[in-house]
A protein has these predicted regions:
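Beta-lactam-recognizing serine transpeptidase/beta-lactamase-like catalytic domain environment
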Residues: 1-44, 49-187
Length: 188
């Protein structure tokens, strides 16, 4: 749903041109389709995708457990809420456990089968794009945005080549520079 709304009857009949210009110039932007013209961090809904990528990459099985004692421990950490520990994949999704998906993410991008983190991150980003993130879905809506799946080149530039899995750990829980349109999220 978009807000503010408008009466579509205003766009038919003799005054449709004038009415269209009024809507187009309305500072409340009633013609702005937020479903495709804005993007937002997907947040915890992304954890399902993170789990699927982990399983596809062979670093996660549904019975794999990870501990969570209030969050993922590093620096100030990625906080989590109260729930049991350790958790398997089903419990991690059911409880929306941040720590679990931080472990999975690092195991994907820091996997020894890749020559460096940039390569591992690139594989992860390719998986994310395969779910429809970071590219237009090809609808007939005008103004559709791609969303955003950051690249290792982006982080190389932002951190002058000095970044690692902890630097970008917020991506593991659908935060940080990751962005999708509401329609991309619904398509997932």
């Amino acid at each position: 749903a978009n807000s503010p709304t408008y009466d579509p009857d205003e766009l038919v009949g003799r005054d449709r041109g004038n009415n269209y210009m009024k809507l187009l110039n309305d500072p409340r932007r009633p013609l702005y389709n937020r479903a495709v013209m804005s993007f937002y961090p997907p947040g915890s809904t992304f954890k399902v995708i993170q789990g699927l990528i982990g399983m596809q990459e062979g670093v996660l099985s549904p019975s794999q457990t990870y501990p969570c004692h209030g969050g993922y421990p590093y620096g100030r950490g990625v906080k989590c809420h109260a729930h049991g520990s350790p958790l398997d994949l089903e419990a991690a999704i059911a409880n929306s456990c941040n720590a679990y998906f931080c472990y999975v993410f690092r195991n994907i991008i820091e996997n020894k089968k890749y020559k460096n983190i940039e390569e591992g991150f690139g594989v992860w980003a390719d998986y994310v794009r395969s779910f429809g993130y970071g590219r237009k879905l090809g609808t007939d809506f005008t103004g559709e945005l791609n969303g955003n799946v950051p690249s290792s080149e982006f982080y190389d530039k932002a951190y002058r080549g000095r970044w690692n899995g902890l630097t970008v750990i917020s991506l593991s829980i659908g935060q940080g520079e990751l962005g999708c349109t509401p329609l991309q999220m619904a398509n997932m």
